[in-house]
Amino acid sequence: MTSRLFALIPCAGTGSRSGSALPKQYRTLAGRALLHYTLAAFDACSEFAQTLVVISPDDAHFDARRFAGLRFAVRRCGGASRQASVMNGLIQLAEFGATDADWVLVHDAARPGITPALIRTLIGALKDDPVGGIVALPVADTLKRVPAGGDAIERTESRNGLWQAQTPQMFRIGMLRDAIQRAQLEGRDLTDEASAIEWAGHTPRVVQGSLRNFKVTYPEDFDLAEAILAHPARAS
């Protein structure tokens, strides 16, 4: 039987670094909620059996009317960390018929520059891979190491072989769930899915990402994201 595709959007964060009381995924960019762009990109890919958005149990800001016409489901099962939210979402996917052998693409709600073309590039590159992988970009900037709380440069780090992880990150549901569970049991709170897969002893692959697909984090990022989203992505 052919493995199916599911998308999982952890959306339980408060966006404390964004400088706004409103969680960043609900802020308006170029006329739409930031989250809308992610949902629209996955909605445009008919290959997906379901897209699941995981929000906090006490989220008072989510309004389904802002995303009318898009195909997705919502579950209020967000946890105290991204890792916990993803784990809870993976468990919820069984409700939609997902099996351990199916693929899940986990994507940050705060990366509105994702495109259907990039999603399909990732799927095409990894659909026959035994592990899976992520979209990422080679590090372009020179890297400096500075001690915590300080401002003096200790040394310059080599950027050779370094890639900046993005999302989506694509893995088999069973493998990812087991990897996160193992990390949790060992007291590790990892910041992305690939880290959990690596922790479990597997080797994910990288697929070339896009500068457009950056993560909106700080207040100044909103202006940049709005400028990008105001112009349609070029077809690849």
From Swiss-Prot:
Signal peptide: none
Enzyme superclass (EC): transferase
Site entry (Positions MEP for the nucleophilic attack), positions: 159, 215
Catalysed reactions listed for this entry: 2-C-methyl-D-erythritol 4-phosphate + CTP + H(+) = 4-CDP-2-C-methyl-D-erythritol + diphosphate
Family designation: Belongs to the IspD/TarI cytidylyltransferase family. IspD subfamily.
Protein name: 2-C-methyl-D-erythritol 4-phosphate cytidylyltransferase
Taxon lineage: Bacteria, Pseudomonadati, Pseudomonadota, Betaproteobacteria, Burkholderiales
Residues the record marks as site: Transition state stabilizer: 17, 24
